Curated annotation (Swiss-Prot):
<comment type="similarity">
    <text>Belongs to the TrpC family.</text>
</comment>
<keyword id="KW-0822">Tryptophan biosynthesis</keyword>
<dbReference type="InterPro" id="IPR013785">
    <property type="entry name" value="Aldolase_TIM"/>
</dbReference>
<dbReference type="Pfam" id="PF00218">
    <property type="entry name" value="IGPS"/>
</dbReference>
<keyword id="KW-0456">Lyase</keyword>
<dbReference type="GO" id="GO:0000162">
    <property type="term" value="P:L-tryptophan biosynthetic process"/>
</dbReference>
<dbReference type="GO" id="GO:0004425">
    <property type="term" value="F:indole-3-glycerol-phosphate synthase activity"/>
</dbReference>
<dbReference type="InterPro" id="IPR001468">
    <property type="entry name" value="Indole-3-GlycerolPSynthase_CS"/>
</dbReference>
<keyword id="KW-0057">Aromatic amino acid biosynthesis</keyword>
<keyword id="KW-0210">Decarboxylase</keyword>
<dbReference type="InterPro" id="IPR013798">
    <property type="entry name" value="Indole-3-glycerol_P_synth_dom"/>
</dbReference>
<dbReference type="InterPro" id="IPR011060">
    <property type="entry name" value="RibuloseP-bd_barrel"/>
</dbReference>
<dbReference type="GO" id="GO:0004640">
    <property type="term" value="F:phosphoribosylanthranilate isomerase activity"/>
</dbReference>
<protein>
    <recommendedName>
        <fullName>Indole-3-glycerol phosphate synthase</fullName>
        <ecNumber>4.1.1.48</ecNumber>
    </recommendedName>
</protein>
<dbReference type="InterPro" id="IPR045186">
    <property type="entry name" value="Indole-3-glycerol_P_synth"/>
</dbReference>
<keyword id="KW-0028">Amino-acid biosynthesis</keyword>
<comment type="pathway">
    <text>Amino-acid biosynthesis; L-tryptophan biosynthesis; L-tryptophan from chorismate: step 4/5.</text>
</comment>
Length: 277
């Protein structure tokens, strides 16, 4: 019997989590909360408009820990980080809500979104429509669908639920087969290429570059994970990739928003430093 991968363990836990949560708050109750939530802020549109101008469209991630790295940021105040990112030039935010593996929380998403005007994606492992409605009830503007965690029928069902409650969808792929499935099953314009293999957690930017020619021009390619320095950003720009999801590089910095500027808007850093002096 093979040992379950990290992703397989996370997904198994998600099914348990949905059962536990739905026993406390019914889907009907969640739907009422979702209808009463603030209007979505237009996650996909914000990224597309920025990338059209060939400017970095950065989804800046708020993440305390990960299964592969443990605790990444000790001083963790989501609202503070969100404000720092907004000042640093982020287009959107990503907030981890997975409790068991990433030390996330639903409250972190609510706190971050309340502190800024940026659209926010709920970064979690979606396996059931309940979680999609829950995301909207929490105030999220977008949800993540990970192709390697879903079959095509479930993927389509979750995307339909997202559309029903007004959420954008970011579909995440890691290889050619997953990309083909995503393009065939979903019409979302947001295609994220995770440079991290979620089964082994190894990272390679070649993943994005290899898949790029197969992503249609009417979809927005978003490179995720492994962007650590200016050379990485410039490599993507040369290949006409302008949208990024970055977490760890920012979370390890004392000032996450300033690190965002260093990576993506270096001409702004000098001005910011002068303002701080």
């Amino acid at each position: 019997m093979s040992v379950p991968t990290v992703l397989e363990r996370i997904i198994a836990r998600k099914f348990q989590e949905v059962a536990e949560r739905s026993a406390h708050v019914s889907l009907a109750e969640l739907e009422g909360l979702a209808k009463a939530a603030d209007a979505p802020r237009g996650f996909a549109n914000a990224l597309i408009e920025q990338a059209k101008r060939k400017q970095p469209a950065v989804i800046a991630e708020i993440k305390k820990a990960s299964p592969s790295k443990g605790v990444i940021r000790e001083h963790f105040v989501p609202a503070e980080i969100a404000v720092s990112y907004e000042k640093g030039g982020a287009t959107c935010l990503s907030v981890l809500t997975d409790v068991d593996y990433f030390q996330g929380a639903d409250e972190y998403l609510q706190q971050a979104r309340a502190a800024v005007s940026l659209p926010v994606i709920r970064k979690d492992f979606m396996v059931d429509p309940y979680q999609i409605v829950e995301a909207r009830a929490l105030g999220a503007d977008c949800v993540l669908l990970i192709v390697s965690a879903l079959d095509d029928v479930k993927m389509a069902e979750l995307a339909a639920t997202a559309k029903d409650v007004g959420l954008d969808v970011l579909v995440e792929v890691h290889d050619g087969d997953e990309l083909e499935r995503a393009l065939k099953t979903l019409d979302t314009p947001l295609v994220g290429v995770n440079n991290r293999n979620l089964h082994t957690f190894e990272v390679s930017l070649e993943t994005t570059l290899d898949l790029l020619p197969r992503i249609p021009r009417d979809r927005l390619a978003i490179t995720e994970s492994g962007i650590l320095n200016r050379a990485d950003v410039e490599l993507m720009a040369i290949n006409e990739v302008y949208s990024f999801l970055v977490g760890e590089a920012f979370m390890r910095a004392e000032q996450p928003g300033l690190e965002l500027q260093r990576l993506f808007f270096p001409e702004q850093v000098k001005k910011t430093v002068q303002q701080l002096d």
